[in-house]
Amino acid sequence: DTALGIDLGIKSLAVCSDGRTFDNPKNLQKSLGRLKLLQKRLSRKQKGSSNRNKARIRVARLQEYIANSRKDNLHKITHALTHDSQVRTICMEDLNVKGMQRNHHLAQAVGDASFGMFLTLLEYKCSWYGVNLIKTGRFAPSSKTCGKCGHVYKGLKLNERSWICPKCGTHHDRDFNAACNIKEFGLKALPTERGKVKPVDCPLVDDRPRVLKSNGRKKQEKKGGIGFSEAAKSLVLR
């Protein structure tokens, strides 16, 4: 099975271990100036007036447009990730979205990217298309680990988008390297030894009436009742 690692971020919404990159459209940021202007006009209208109601509708329509644009983009990305026939396993980091939103410097950007909705859409689409979804530990050093030699570069800063491994000298793109490491971390979490699977009894079409009758007879015997065949025999003997 082909596995895929995904690293979520602010600049690029999703970077995949196969080289694909999905940009973050930043719907709220693009419309933020217009939204602030409409909200300012709304605050200046007299309460209860028809002009205030019209201004409120304009604000609501713009907010709805932003939400629909964001949701449409997330649907397209998650569909592209799960509808690929070659991808059977997706590995992702178990992000603490609520904790990220507590950071006042990142709260608006994280909310605009909508990581929570991305994970929700990806989960149910994976179940639809039969794709395994593996979540790696949120504290795993996916960005700081060299994908070639495994060295953990603890001095990597958040604003460094690329870095060179001090041990082997390999040049890494931060997001792509993280996606590859997330894939490896996820595959290592899979069980290496598989136990014996007990097959489920699934009778053929021709055998189903016989199996259903035998099951019904067993249920009645457990309850202490008389099966259909025994009742018929007793009537014939009479």
What are the language-model segments listed below?
Residues 1-17, 122, 175:
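Gly/Thr-rich phosphate-binding beta-strand-loop-beta motif of the actin/hexokinase/Hsp70
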Residues 17-20, 83, 149, 168:
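Short acidic-glycine loop/turn motifs at beta-strand connectors
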Residues 3, 89, 171:
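Hydrophobic "anchor" residues on beta-strands that sit immediately upstream
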Residues 81, 88-95, 134:
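Short glycine-rich phosphate-binding loop at a beta-alpha junction
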Residues 109, 113-238:
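Positively charged, low-complexity nucleic-acid-binding target-recognition regions
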Residues 12-57:
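Metal-dependent catalytic core segments for phosphate chemistry
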Residues 60-84:
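Phosphate-interacting basic helix/loop segments used at nucleotide- and nucleic-acid interfaces
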Residues 94-112:
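RNase H catalytic domain
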